């Protein structure tokens, strides 16, 4: 069958456009599944991307766009406590117990922090100096050991409001100590995956993301000083103190940054959320400067068909970190790109949204002996093209994932019926 799709290739924070040792739970280990919704107690609206952690373990996940989560916990870890934290809300905890062998429904309500952050403004300080001090304290505040994470990865592409690509993976991520702000020796290995694609013949343009599962290495803004900026490049940015925020019941500075110099490539603006006590960077939000669309296009677009106009709209992301026993670890990453495509001499264009996210679901101290180079996933590989190599019919079994949102689940069910 002839493939008439045109293909666009994009890197993690770039695109490709065409014409069209994982850490599983032991099989003998009993799991208890806890699931439910997390909502704002004031307006009863769901809260997405809430970080959930089972205390006493390295098990965790995040809520989906509907505020829903499910978490599989080994029975021998119970009783314990589930902790939920999100920026701007008071952290909450709820006991988890082993009352039966069935799944448990746990619905939680979180309270906005309101005006409890006035102490941060009393602290004051120069925002630039605070950021510089936080960068210098990275070796002290973050893991000093090799860590092997288990993670769940999902990438999606939408044409307008319709999903045309959904790919998911269970991954291993090897992270090196944070005493050096580089990515040397860090690796990603895919354990299993699955893909769902729209079969519509009208989808004449296919969007492919390069290096998607590699994002915990490239987009770790604390570890990778080439992503945003290093201490030596701090003079290239303007910093401003914004209203503070509460994260995990700890007061945080919110310091925005934007470039004040012009480079041959586009720079980022964004916000650092820095612990007011120990200067740990708990959250980073970033967005690529879109003033020079040509620079942005050169930065993110790897390949496209001739005759196709590509217009970037948004390149943004967020990275969060979780503190356990005094050290912070990578927790969640989300990267989003929006752009328009149209063929020359045609009146209408289509808007595409490419999104990739990964949550770290468990962690152990490890060394690099179990991850061979030939088994790793590189920054230039296209996961959606290779996902079938990792297919497993028991994809969901015994693993913690980001539950699909209602709109995503509907898209999946619709594709399955065709």
What are these regions (language model features)?
Residues 30-47:
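Structural motif
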Residues 50-54, 67, 82, 122:
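Hydrophobic beta-strand segments
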Residues 58-68:
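Short, acidic Ser/Thr/Gly-rich low-complexity loop/linker segments typical of extracellular
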Residues 69-71, 104-106:
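Short strand-edge motifs at loop-to-beta-strand transitions and within beta-strands
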Residues 71-78:
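Short Pro-Gly-centered beta-turn/loop motif in secreted/extracellular proteins
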Residues 83-94:
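A short, solvent-exposed loop/turn motif at the edges and junctions
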Residues 105-237, 248-251, 300-301, 305-418:
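Surface-exposed, low-complexity/disordered segments
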Residues 225-275, 280-288, 322-323:
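Extended beta-strand-rich segments in extracellular/periplasmic secretory proteins, especially
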């Amino acid at each position: 069958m002839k493939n008439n799709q045109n293909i666009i290739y994009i890197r993690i924070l770039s695109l490709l456009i065409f014409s069209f040792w994982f850490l599983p739970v032991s099989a003998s280990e009993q799991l208890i599944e806890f699931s439910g919704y997390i909502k704002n107690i004031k307006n009863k609206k769901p809260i997405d991307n809430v970080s959930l952690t089972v205390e006493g373990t390295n098990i965790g996940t995040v809520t989906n766009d509907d505020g829903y989560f499910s978490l599989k916990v080994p029975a021998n870890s119970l009783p314990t406590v589930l902790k939920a934290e999100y920026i701007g809300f008071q952290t909450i905890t709820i006991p988890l117990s082993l009352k039966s062998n069935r799944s448990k429904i746990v619905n939680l309500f979180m309270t906005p922090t309101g005006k409890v952050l006035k102490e941060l403004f009393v602290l004051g300080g120069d925002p630039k100096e605070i950021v510089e001090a936080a960068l210098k304290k990275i070796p002290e505040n973050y893991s000093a050991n090799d860590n092997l994470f288990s993670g769940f990865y999902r990438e999606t592409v939408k044409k307008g409001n319709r999903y045309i690509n959904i790919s998911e993976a269970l991954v291993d991520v090897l992270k090196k100590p944070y005493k050096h702000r580089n990515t040397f020796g860090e690796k990603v290995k895919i354990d299993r995956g699955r893909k769902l694609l729209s079969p519509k013949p009208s989808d004449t343009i296919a969007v492919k993301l390069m290096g998607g599962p590699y994002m915990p290495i490239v987009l770790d803004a604390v570890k990778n000083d080439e992503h945003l900026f290093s201490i030596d490049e701090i003079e290239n940015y303007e910093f401003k103190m914004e209203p503070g925020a509460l994260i995990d019941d700890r007061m945080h500075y919110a310091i925005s940054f934007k470039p004040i110099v012009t480079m041959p490539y586009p720079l980022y603006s964004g916000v650092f959320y820095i612990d007011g006590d120990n200067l740990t960077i708990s959250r980073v939000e970033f967005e690529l400067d879109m003033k020079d669309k040509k620079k942005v296009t050169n930065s993110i677009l790897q390949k496209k068909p001739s005759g196709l106009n590509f217009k970037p709209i948004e390149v943004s992301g967020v990275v969060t970190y979780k503190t356990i026993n005094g050290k912070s670890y990578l927790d969640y990453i989300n990267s989003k790109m929006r752009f328009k495509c149209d063929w020359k001499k045609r009146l209408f264009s289509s808007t595409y949204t490419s999104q990739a996210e990964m949550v770290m679901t468990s962690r152990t101290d490890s060394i690099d002996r179990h991850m061979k180079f030939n088994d790793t996933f590189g920054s230039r590989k296209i996961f959606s093209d290779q996902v079938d190599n990792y297919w497993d019919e028991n994809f969901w079994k015994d693993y913690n994932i980001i539950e699909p949102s209602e709109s995503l689940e509907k898209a999946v069910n619709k594709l399955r019926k065709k």
